C-alpha cells in the first residue's frame, strides 16, 4: 500500500490551516514581485537599495535563487557593508546551503552594526537552519492531525522556550491559535507579524483565520479574509485560501440581520452553494437570533475575563438550543478556566458530538487541559515518539487520586494507536468496570473489538452509547472494518471487509480508496478504477478530491493528480496532499527545464539542494526520471537525496526506500530501512507511528520477495529461500511470498511443486490473477497443457477486462501451438492495459492438502544446488540478446512494454521469412596453398511451426573459393604441393649426366608445373530447431571436386537454471581450398605420374589417387552452462575425428572454460567483459598441401587465454553489436612427413632428399626440407591472439531489415577477415 494512503487526512478548515507553509504556485511572478515592491516602497524616500533587497527576499521566498542573487549583487554595489544588505546576504547563503559563509556574514555584521536588528534577525534565521528537520516534520504532522496542543509544546521545546524564528513564527502562532487557552497569545503574535510586515500575505491569512476561530473576533476575521481575496495578482494562493476560509466561516455564523447580508452577498456570487442556502433556511439548533446573540456575548465576556457573565450567556444560548456546539464549547472553556476539569471535559465531548464537522476545534482544547504538569510531559513524550516512557508516565498518573479515568483513557488510546491492542482492551475494560457507561471507554473498546474482528461484541458496546454520539458510532463501525481490513494480508478477505464498509458508507471517499487499493493489490485494476470512478468523475467535497489525488498519485497518473489538485484549495491540503502537490510542482518545473539541457546532473543537484524533511523532493526527482525510463539518473537522484544528511527521518527513509523498490533496487531499500529496526523502538531506531510501521512491514516483505526473485534468477535458490523465509513466517496469509516460493521451485526445476503451491493460493482466492498467471505457467512447465488451458479460460471468464487474464490465456494457447490465437490474446491484453494506463477503462467482473502445499518448508529445500545459464563454449561473450539484458521499454509501464515485446517477437517467429546476402572471406596463406578467398550468396527461407516454438529452415548457398596461382618459379613452394616434388626433381635432373634412379626421367623433356585454381558450387541445407533440440542435414558445396554429406544434432535440456548441451555433428573444415573442397593432383595424369604407376603398378595405385582433401570433422561435444546474477559461467569438452579423401585420418580432443559478466548497462546499451581459456590438440599435424595432408591448422597442443569485450546497443531503428578480444596463445606442432598416406611416395621423397643434392647446384635445391629429410619440421610458437566481430542493423519497415557485418581474427598461424551484407524480409504480417 502506498505510504500516503495510510496518512491521516484532515477535512476541517482548522486542521488544514494549522499545517506547514502553503505551497507556492509555480508560475512566473516577476510582475507580482514588482507589485509587492511598489506597495512597500510607496514612500518617496525609499532608497533603491531597499527596493533591490525587497526583490531579493521575494525571489528567495519563490526559491528562484539566480534572480535573488542578481538583486542582491546590485544592492551590494550600492552599499556592500550596510546592515540590511549583509542580512539579506546571509539569508541567501543560508538558503542555498552555504552555512559557513552565512556564519561568516553574521560575524561581519556583528562587527559592522552590533546593535542592529539585522544581527538578531540573521541570528534567528541561522538558528532555525540548525533545527532538526526530522523533529520539525514530526511536529508539523501533529499539527496536521489536529493535535495542536502537543504540536505547540513540541515547537516550544524546539525553540528552547524562546521566541520562534521569524520563518517559523507564522506556522507556530497559527498552530497555537487552534488551542483555545492560547488563542490570545497566538492572536497577539500574528498581529505583531502583520504589523511589522503588512506584505506578508501568509501571515495576513493566518491572522484572519485565527480571528474567525473566536466568536468575538469572527466578523473582523471575515473582513480581513474578504480584503485578502482582492490580492489575486500579488498572492493568488493566499487569496484562494482566503476565499475558502471565508466560505467556511459563513457556515459558523448565526443567521441574523448582521450576518444575513454577508450570506446573501456570497450566494449572489455563488448561486450553486446549496449548503449555505440550506443553512440560511434551516439553521442548526433552532431559532438563531437570540441564541447567536447570547453566544456572541458569552465569548466577548470570556475574552474580558468575566467568567460568571460568560457562563450565564452560554447557558442562555443552550436553553434555546441544547446542541449548539459553539455554546457547549464556550461552557467548556469557562469550566476549564474555573478549574473544573471534569466539567470542561464533558462540555467539550458534547460539543464534538453535537457537530462532528467542527470537532477538531475542541480536541485541542481537551488536550490543552492537560498541558501543564505531568500531562504536558506525557504529550511531549508522545510527540517525540517516546511511547514507552509516555506509557510508564500515564500508568503512574493513573494511580494518583482522581486521575484514574483520564490517565487510563489516554493510556488505552495510546496503546491502541501504537498497536498494543490487547493492552488497550484491558485498560478500557478496567474503566468500564468502574464506570460502566463511560462513553469514551465504550467507544474505545468498540474500536478495539472492531479492529480484532469481533464485530458482534463491538456493536453490542456501541448500542450502549448515547444517541448524541450517533455519528461517531457510525464512524467507528466503518473505521473498525477498515482497521480489520488493514490487519489482514489475505487480499480476498480484505476486499470483502471493505465492500461491507462501503455498503455502510457509500460516499465515504476513504473507504473507497482503501477498497480500490485492496483491489489493486489483488490485481483487479479495472474494478479498482470502477470503485473510484464516482469520486474521480464528480468530486463533490474536498475529501473526495483528497482521496482522488491519493489514488491517482499512487497509480502514477500525474496528469489526473494535477487536475484534481487544481480544484482543491490549499487550505484543504493535508500533509500528504501538500507533499504530493510539492512533488507535482517539482516534477513539472524540472521536466520543463530538462528539455533545454543535454546533461541533467546539474539540474538534479540543484533540485535536491533544498531541505527535504519528508523525502517528497527526492522521490519527485527520482520518479520523474523513472517514468521516463531513465533509471541511471533515477538512481543518482535517490543516492544524492538519501546521502545528503546522515540523520534521515523515518519519513525520508520510508519514502526513499519505496522509490528504490520502484526502480528494482531492493538492496538499497533494505540498507535505508536497517536503522529503523523493527519499528517498535525496543532495539535499533525509534518507535514508529502505526501507519509508518505498516509501511515498514510492507516494504520489508516486498524487499524479501524482490531479493528472493533476484537470487532465483541468478540460480541461487538456497540463498533466495533464506531471504524469503522470514516473510513466509511473518505473515502466513500473505500471497506474494507464497508465489515467490513457487517461483523458487520453478527455477529449481520442480514445476510440479510450484504448480501445487500456485493452485493452493488460487483455491484460497480464485480472483487472484497473479496466482492464476503463475499457475498457468507452472502447468505449462509441468507439461499439463490441458490444465493450463482450463485455468486460463476460467480467468478470462471471471476477469475479461483485465490484461493479466489474457496474458495467461496467451501462455496456454502458445503451449498448445495456436500461434494466431496467441497473438490475438496478447493484443487484447495490450489494449486492456493501455486503457488502464490512460485512465479510459470502460466499465463493464479438500483443505488439508492445500494447507500442506502452502506451508513453507521446515528446512531450506534448495541447499547445495548449482547454477545455470546458456552460453556457447569458446564463443565470444554473448550472454543472451541485448533486449533481454539492457533494453528498457520506451513506455514507463513495464507490462505494456513486455506485452509489446512479446507481440513483436511472436509476430516475427510466426511469419515465414526469406533472407538473402552477399559475403566475403579472406584467409592468410601462400598462393596456391593456404591462402583462401571465398564469396558466397546465402539464400534462406524460414517456415515457423508450433506457434513459433519450432521452425523449419531451407537454405542454398552458392559458394566460390580460390587460392590463387602457385608460384611455379619457386623451388621452395613447388615441392610442397601435391606430388610436385617428383616433377621438380625430374626437371632439375634433366640434362645431368647421371640422376641415379631418375635416369629415365632425365632423358625426357622437362615437365610443366601449374597449380592453384578456383572452385564453385552450391551448398544445400535443411534445418529444424526448437528450444531444446536442433538438427540439420546439409552438404558441402555441390560442384567442388569433393562433396560431403554433412549434418548434426544438438540437445540442450534445461534442468532448473542449469543447461546441459550435448551435440554430435559432421562439418567441413573450411581452412583452405584443400580442406574445404578438395584438390585434383595435376601430376596424376602427367608423364611422371604415368611412368610411376607403370613402374610401381598396383602398389602405387592403392596409395595414390587423382584427388585428395575435402576434410570433415566428426565432432562430439558436451558442455554445462551456469549463471550467477549477471555473470555467466561455462565449461565443457569434446572429441573429434577428422577424415577426408586420400587424407590421413586424424583425431582431436578439446576443452574450455570461461566466464563473462555484465559490467555496465543503461536503457539502450550494455557492456560485457569476460575471460576464456581454451585447449585443443590433434594427433597429427596436417597443416600442409602435399598429397595426403589435410590443409588445416592442427597443432598437437594449443593453449589460449583471451579477454573478450562486448558492446551492444540500440537507438530507434538502429542496433549494433561489437565484440573484440585480445589474448595470448601458445601452440606446438610436430614434424610431419610429406606424404603421410603413401609409403611409396614418402620413400621416394626420402630418396630425393638423400640423393638429389649430389647432382644439384645450391640454387636448385628442391626446398630446405629436402636437404636433410622429406619431413616438414615441427615448431613451437607463442604470441598474441585476438580479433573483433561487428554487426550493425537497421529496420526500414516492419518487414524489412538490413544487416552489415565484418570480422577479423588472428589465431594460430593464420589471420582471417570477412564481411557480409544481408537483408531480412518477413513474408507475412501477423
Swiss-Prot record:
Signal sequence extent: 1-30
One cellular-component annotation, GO: cell outer membrane
Family matches, as Gene3D superfamilies: Tetratricopeptide repeat domain (1.25.40.10)
Associated pathway: Glycan metabolism; bacterial cellulose biosynthesis
Subcellular location: Cell outer membrane
Keyword Cytoplasm recorded: no
Positions of region (Disordered): 841-867
Principal cellular location given in the protein's record: membrane
PROSITE patterns for this protein: TPR, TPR_REGION
SMART domains the UniProt entry points to: TPR
Gene Ontology biological process terms, A to Z: cellulose biosynthetic process; UDP-alpha-D-glucose metabolic process
Membrane topology: Peripheral membrane protein
Function, as annotated: Required for maximal bacterial cellulose synthesis. It may be involved in the formation of a membrane complex for extrusion of the cellulose product.
Name assigned to this protein: Cellulose synthase operon protein C
Species: Komagataeibacter sucrofermentans (strain ATCC 700178 / DSM 15973 / CECT 7291 / JCM 9730 / LMG 18788 / BPR 2001)
Source organism phylogeny: Bacteria, Pseudomonadati, Pseudomonadota, Alphaproteobacteria, Acetobacterales
